[in-house]
């Protein structure tokens, strides 16, 4: 596995005004990559997109950290431009989503990042009466984004989000996969966030199974939105499933809030997940549990 951290959870002052702190911290704890949020709307502390790209390109080279993904924020609660936020279910706000995502795709291309996150934010409640129209807007919008991303050698990862934050529409791996298949695009995959999955999925294994073969990226935070191990997600089962399906993408850790503090959350997260990965690989060997293979 490759391990990354979602930088925005360190706070905006660090992420935009003193980002070298993030790079130094992640190298000290053995991370492979950093996940960034572009400076847009209420995010950025006045840093321009040009400054953001130049600074992170320099730091990524200096610290030999990959940039695992660029993650725009979606949904009314998190979108940088709330309340006039982007969605994937209504034409005008979907056009905004397309413009914003293309801008982020350009940044990802400059920074050498393979992925940009997209999510389903809804414009109004979805019901049996309007679901077909919403799906049509989402599919058309995703196709437009994917066509642009393909020209930049960037892929999009579609994050499955819980219904309390994004509304009842496309909340499960199975429904994300259905929507992706409707687009017909090869550069659109799935991003699991284990906090959201805890609301929507039957269990960890079935979530990973349903996402195949489109599981390209993941966010690791626990059921209480804290660092892995601080809640009750069965991350050993998660790791066994990932090993079984030969997952080779990033495991991006996040914690919101940074409990009990940044250093402990960052250190405990990667230490615990690496232990879970090690145990998973041991449990799947033919010698387990007797010490010899039959």
What is each PLM-predicted segment?
Residues 1-113, 132-133, 143, 150, ...:
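N-terminal pre-domain/capping segments
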């Amino acid at each position: 596995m490759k391990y990354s951290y979602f930088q925005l959870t360190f706070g905006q002052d660090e992420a935009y005004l003193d980002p070298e702190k993030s790079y130094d911290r992640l190298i000290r704890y053995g991370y492979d990559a950093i996940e960034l949020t572009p400076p847009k709307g209420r995010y950025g502390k006045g840093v321009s997109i040009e400054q953001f790209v130049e600074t992170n390109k320099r730091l990524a080279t200096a610290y030999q950290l990959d940039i695992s993904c660029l993650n725009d924020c979606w949904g009314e609660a998190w979108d940088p431009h709330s309340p006039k936020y982007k969605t994937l279910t209504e034409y005008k706000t979907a056009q905004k989503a397309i413009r914003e995502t293309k801008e982020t795709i350009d940044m990802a291309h400059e920074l050498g990042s393979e992925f940009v996150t997209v999510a389903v934010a809804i414009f109004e409640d979805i019901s049996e009466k309007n679901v077909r129209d919403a799906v049509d807007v989402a599919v058309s919008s995703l196709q437009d984004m994917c066509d642009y991303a393909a020209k930049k050698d960037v892929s999009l990862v579609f994050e499955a989000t819980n219904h309390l934050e994004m509304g009842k529409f496309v909340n499960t791996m199975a429904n994300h996969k259905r929507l992706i298949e409707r687009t017909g695009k090869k550069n659109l995959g799935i991003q699991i966030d284990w906090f959201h999955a805890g609301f929507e999925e039957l269990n960890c294994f079935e979530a990973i199974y349903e996402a195949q073969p489109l599981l390209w990226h993941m966010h690791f935070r626990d059921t209480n939105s804290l660092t892995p191990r601080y809640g009750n997600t069965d991350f050993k089962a998660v790791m066994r499933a990932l090993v079984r399906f030969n997952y080779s993408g990033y495991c991006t850790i996040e914690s919101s809030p940074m409990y009990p503090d940044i250093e402990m959350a960052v250190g405990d997260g990667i230490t615990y997940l690496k232990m879970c990965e090690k145990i998973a690989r041991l449990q799947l060997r033919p010698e387990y549990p007797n010490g010899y293979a039959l």
